[in-house]
Amino acid sequence: MRRDVPQDSVRRNEQIRAREVRLIGAEGEQLGIISRNDAIALAKEKGLDLVEVAATADPPVCRVMDYGKYKYEQQKKKQEAKKRQTVVQIKEIKVRPKTDEHDYQTKLKHVRRFLEEGDRCKVTVFFRGREIVHKDRGLTILDRFVEDTKDLAKLDQEARAEGRTLQMMLAPIPKK
């Protein structure tokens, strides 16, 4: 198999293999089916390139255009799409069953900020020593987080015990 053209690029000028092509002019007008060599000559006359637009068509559809400009516009579109793409992160807040009110409010403020930024938030209650006997206190704290963030988040994953911890996941409610 010949490898004249890298897989991600389009064929242009002499790289086009077909003998005849359906030609589209620089302004988008149909010029009909002509030989590849005539099409290349026509493009060179105008100082432009012959670019294969639809290789699978019979005969292939080619367009007279400035390949450098075309490539630049494609790159810009790709960058723009990448910019619009958001990466959702999982932030974690750790609390203890004996967390005091002020500390709870600080942690709650952090959770609310994470959710407003569009990140998922994992709330973990970790137990030390004999505290594990009082799992109900941990569940109470997790329920309180759910109640205090119900305007911003929905419960994504119910509270579950894992070793010496209780964990739950909050996901932001999508903005409309």
Curated annotation (Swiss-Prot):
Chief place where the protein resides: cytoplasm
One GO term describing the cellular component: membrane
Gene3D superfamilies per the UniProt record, alphabetical: Translation initiation factor 3 (IF-3), C-terminal domain, Translation initiation factor 3 (IF-3), N-terminal domain
Superkingdom of origin: Bacteria
InterPro entries: T_IF-3_C_sf, T_IF-3_N_sf, Translation_initiation_fac3_CS, Translation_initiation_fac_3, Translation_initiation_fac_3_C, Translation_initiation_fac_3_N
A GO BP annotation: ribosome disassembly
Record keywords, A-Z: Cytoplasm, Initiation factor, Protein biosynthesis
Recorded GO MF terms: ribosome binding; translation initiation factor activity
Subcellular location: Cytoplasm
Quaternary structure note: Monomer.
Role noted for this protein: IF-3 binds to the 30S ribosomal subunit and shifts the equilibrium between 70S ribosomes and their 50S and 30S subunits in favor of the free subunits, thus enhancing the availability of 30S subunits on which protein synthesis initiation begins.
Family membership: Belongs to the IF-3 family.
Identification of the protein by name: Translation initiation factor IF-3
Gene source species: Nitratidesulfovibrio vulgaris (strain ATCC 29579 / DSM 644 / CCUG 34227 / NCIMB 8303 / VKM B-1760 / Hildenborough)
Gene this chain is encoded by: infC
